[in-house]
């Protein structure tokens, strides 16, 4: 018999240069998780820290100053020293989410898209860092983070390398596997193929997205709040992950 965990333990991995750690903790706590920041160096030294967690979040920022490319060194640390542990984490049914720089790291590790598929996050098509609010449409029923969402999410983006690119075969596979988790329903801000804002792996447990739903968890965080704007908060996405993790 499965006994529900009232507050699943979530780890937010802080690498040198990540800067959305506190926002991520706030979002997870508001969604019902017991969230903790853990240093990447601590996990590398003691991988067993993952054993007692039910959720894992790789936050946004500029890990390792984006040296050699956004998320590359973050991914290198993960893929060379934690491959088996991360695979076991997902195999145990535990949800993982990477946001912005965290998404870039997941792509570079190969955890996304997974299943021998190849994709990348390249420089924005206009060649500039972009910081604006966007509208996201949840579209995947496979992804445990988005399957129960029935309304768009309005949240900010802040990136210079957020353009999702892949070849035609990978795009066809993502579509047929229902791995496209989120699309831009507002104008595409970076030239991502098929308006893709986020994807999941074939298990539906691992989600990566460029926008920052953790920055619109309560209505007052919206820039138009004082003008009466309501709705579109990103809390539901995190609540979905927490619901799944609480059953582990």
Features from the language model and the residues they span:
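Amide-donor transfer/coupling interface in amidating biosynthetic enzymes
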Residues: 2-3, 42, 48, 86-87, ...
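Short, well-ordered, mixed-charge alpha-helical segments that flank or form enzyme active sites
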Residues: 104-108, 114-115, 145, 164-166
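Short hydrophobic/aromatic-enriched beta-strand-loop microsegments
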Residues: 117-119
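N-terminal beta1-alpha1 cap of cysteine-dependent amidohydrolase-like domains
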Residues: 1-99, 103-113, 123-130, 193, ...
């Amino acid at each position: 018999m499965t006994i529900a965990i009232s507050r699943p333990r979530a780890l937010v991995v802080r690498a040198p240069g990540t800067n959305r750690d506190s926002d991520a903790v706030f979002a997870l706590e508001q969604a019902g998780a017991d969230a903790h920041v853990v240093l990447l160096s601590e996990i590398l030294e003691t991988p067993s820290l993952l054993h007692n967690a039910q959720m894992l979040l790789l936050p946004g920022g500029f890990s390792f100053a984006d040296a050699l490319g956004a998320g590359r060194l973050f991914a290198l640390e993960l893929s060379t020293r934690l491959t088996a542990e991360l695979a076991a984490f997902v195999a145990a049914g535990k949800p993982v989410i990477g946001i912005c720089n965290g998404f870039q790291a997941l792509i570079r590790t190969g955890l996304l898209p997974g299943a021998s598929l190849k994709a990348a996050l390249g420089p924005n098509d206009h060649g500039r860092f972009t910081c604006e609010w966007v509208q996201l449409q949840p579209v995947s029923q496979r992804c445990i983070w988005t399957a129960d969402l029935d309304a768009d999410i309005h949240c900010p983006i802040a990136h210079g390398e957020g353009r999702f690119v892949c070849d035609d075969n990978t795009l066809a596979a993502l579509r047929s596997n229902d791995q496209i988790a989120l699309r831009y329903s507002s104008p595409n801000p970076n030239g991502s193929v098929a308006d893709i804002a986020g994807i999941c792996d074939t298990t539906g447990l691992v989600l990566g997205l460029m926008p920052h739903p953790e920055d619109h968890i309560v209505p007052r965080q919206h820039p138009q709040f004082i003008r009466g704007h309501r709705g579109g908060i990103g809390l539901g996405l995190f609540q979905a992950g927490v619901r799944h993790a609480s059953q582990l």
